[in-house]
Amino acid sequence: MRYLPLTDDNRREMLEAIGAREIDDLFVDVPAEARLKGDIEGLPKQASEMAVEKHMRRLSKKNLAANDAPFFLGAGAYRHHVPASVDHLIQRGEFLTAYTPYQPEIAQGTLQVLFEFQTQVARMFGTDIANASLYDGSTACWEAIVMAGRITRKSRAVLAHGLHPHYVSTAQTMAKFTKDELFSGAPDLDADCDEDAIIAQIDDRTSCVVVQYPDILGRIPDLQKIADAAHDRGALLVAVVTEPVALGLIEAPGALGADIVVGEGQSLGVGLNFGGPYLGLFGCREKFVRQMPGRLCGETVDADGKRGFVLTLSTREQHIRREKATSNICTNSGLCALAFSIHMTLLGGAGLEKLARINHSRARLAAQRLGEVKGVRVLNDAYFNEFTIVLPSDAREVVRELAERGVLGGVSLGRLYPDEEALANGLVVAVTETCTPEDIETFATTLSAVLEGEAA
């Protein structure tokens, strides 16, 4: 395809068509203080590639990188060790096929790995079936809500207070364009989940109850109790898993009554990636497969009787009129799904359980040590690799001070819930296998120094 640059007349016609006078009008939403004025500081107007690289490296050293500091951030995105073999294998030629595997004859590598990925997710979630992935955990959560509405023919979804606020926000944004009614709220700083409070919101209009497992505070809700109550009122239970490594140790949601299980697959194979791309996981009961969004890869045989893989049941999604489709999502996070599948394969079932046990033991060590810091209260007794501590002052300021001292010490609830003053002192701490006992000790001693007002 030829590249034909625009002429001044072309630009003028395009601006007139959208009602803009000049190019700068397209950037009015960017705050004035964020726009570049004049030359880039430290660089001349013309600079060589080497000079620009040197300048960028110098700027990057001002950042506190995840690999260079004790790292206890979580709340939906987790730092795990990803074996080098994952990045090596995803670059193999078998997977470097065209974007969409519509021609199975030339995309067997991609299709087979997606088939295996679906199998891994279904086994992990305890569901009958899983799709070939969605964009990320939050959009998968919304897709589960509207899927439940189609199945039950109801439009009220109860979002448990422990559901990640970003997932709630995504659902609220999408619900502006549908008839779905969402009930949600902020969590309380209680040690245990209040399942009875969730159940009290279920009525005959409820399509589904959405429960994070473990929740945003690290607590582990009683899914079976909520599932039984939801089913009694003709509603479905949607379980949301933001940390899939937890399922190496705790019971799969599908085994506890969840009808639809969704989640974020970033923890396995993908990495933090500055917040994306990530990987939406989606599983459900087989009887709901026709209402499930996204792609499905199936196993078949070719004309010679050899095993092969194809996209199947496509008529429920992209090969159909828009108003009849199950979703507006007609793609999947294929590369991230491949990385997830390779990492899972390298671990195996026993490896995943071992990894989960290491995470849990490190979290227990951290909770014990942080609980010894004067003024700190560990909120929850039951958790996987993430728990909440309550500080004597605003956690946002404490986190800022910790970062200045070289420790990335958790996610403040005040950042996640800026309008909830009662949560301001809460700090969510995630502890994975990358957190060494030395890191935990550094975190505890630094936190103690910050709270006692000691100079850095």
What name fits each language-model region?
Residues M1-A34, D39:
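Compact, charge-rich alpha-helical regulatory domains located at protein termini
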Residues R2, T139-G308, I389, R396-R405, ...:
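Conserved PLP-enzyme active-site core in the AAT-like
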Residues L36-E116:
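N-terminal entrance/gating region of PLP-dependent enzymes' catalytic architecture
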Residues R92-P104, A122-T127, T152-R153, A175-F183, ...:
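Gly-rich Lys/Arg/Thr-decorated short loops/hinges at beta-loop-alpha junctions or inter-strand turns
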Residues T97, G109-L111, F115-Q118, A122-I129, ...:
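Conserved internal helical-beta-strand scaffold that buttresses enzyme catalytic cores
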Residues Y102-I106, R123-W142:
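Short loop-beta-helix segment that forms the pyridoxal 5′-phosphate
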Residues L268-N380:
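Active-site C-terminal subdomain of aminotransferase-like
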Residues A350-T445:
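Conserved C-terminal alpha-helix-loop-beta "cap" of PLP-dependent enzymes
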